[in-house]
Amino acid sequence: MPVLHNRISNDALKAKMLAESEPRTTISFYKYFHIADPKVTRDALYQLFTALNVFGRVYLAHEGINAQISVPASNVETFRAQLYAFDPALEGLRLNIALDDDGKSFWVLRMKVRDRIVADGIDDPLFDASNVGEYLQAAEVNAMLDDPDALFIDMRNHYEYEVGHFENALEIPADTFREQLPKAVEMMQAHKDKKIVMYCTGGIRCEKASAWMKHNGFNKVWHIEGGIIEYARKAREQGLPVRFIGKNFVFDERMGERISDEIIAHCHQCGAPCDSHTNCKNDGCHLLFIQCPVCAEKYKGCCSEICCEESALPPEEQRRRRAGRENGNKIFNKSRGRLNTTLGIPEPTE
């Protein structure tokens, strides 16, 4: 029986990936379809992906599959053919190819079985996830952006919206998709006569969100097919204006794809124009925040003076301090006040 999980350290795997000479292609895809036995499907897919040297993150559940992966360029077409042949429901599945890709997005394959492929918090037995809104293609998206009766709803987290979004799109302020769904219904109650256009990174969240809005009495609901990634690709291919401004946040080592030249966000430490996310270099913190090059040098990649000082301590002392510590929120949220370390320690007063 082959080993169906990784047994090599992350550091060794990352070093091996960085030493590779063959280019890689970053791909994302999802499909809502019934999987009778996610564990069996997971094990079969793990062997298929491993044989093709695929890295990335894959979630499976009874409701379908959600994947963000990195494939050696020479294996992309073989991967596509084998994926399509794996299950009739996957035949012809759209694969979103990354827009701004150095091929260094993942260095290990992690494949997990979950209750849902997107954590939505929905427990209504009458909810029909297949009753989705209408798809929009790139040209239709641009037409809707010029329609005064249309409202664009961003179904991504606040830190994704902060660095890039469609023109005049509404933010549903939340840290998670689970929090956003009820908020979207509440915020749109006064606009049921409007055309609701929902979007996300690659389509998986806005597809389910469109079904949730219809379940809650909204009848004019659309969502962008393939999300921001597919929209930007098709708009460029067709010579259309790209109406997404800024950067598209992605959940891998790149942390973003440049869509337009505009920088609409600011460094969370000094306020300078910047849209580069990073994780605090202190292993006891790892807060996700935006940091400009000047502050990165000043704070040595950390989110605060406290973390900067702690990360400079001997490794043994750092481990001692981390032991038993319960970290706080791992994502900086502008609405919660100024930037703070997640260590649960007050910043020194100035």
Swiss-Prot record:
Gene3D superfamilies: 3.30.70.100, Rhodanese-like domain. GO terms for molecular function: oxidoreductase activity, acting on paired donors, with incorporation or reduction of molecular oxygen. It catalyses: uridine(34) in tRNA + AH2 + O2 = 5-hydroxyuridine(34) in tRNA + A + H2O. Pfam families: Rhodanese, Rhodanese_C, UPF0176_N. It is an enzyme of class 1 (oxidoreductase). One of its GO terms (biological process) is tRNA modification. SUPFAM superfamilies: Rhodanese/Cell cycle control phosphatase. Residues 146-240 form the Rhodanese domain. The active site is at C200 (cysteine persulfide intermediate). Keywords: Oxidoreductase, tRNA processing. Its EC number is 1.14.-.-. Disulfide bonds: none annotated. Coiled coil: none annotated. HAMAP family: TrhO. Catalyzes oxygen-dependent 5-hydroxyuridine (ho5U) modification at position 34 in tRNAs, the first step in 5-carboxymethoxyuridine (cmo5U) biosynthesis. May be part of an alternate pathway, which is able to bypass cmo5U biogenesis in a subset of tRNAs under aerobic conditions. Belongs to the TrhO family. This is tRNA uridine(34) hydroxylase. It comes from Escherichia coli O81 (strain ED1a).
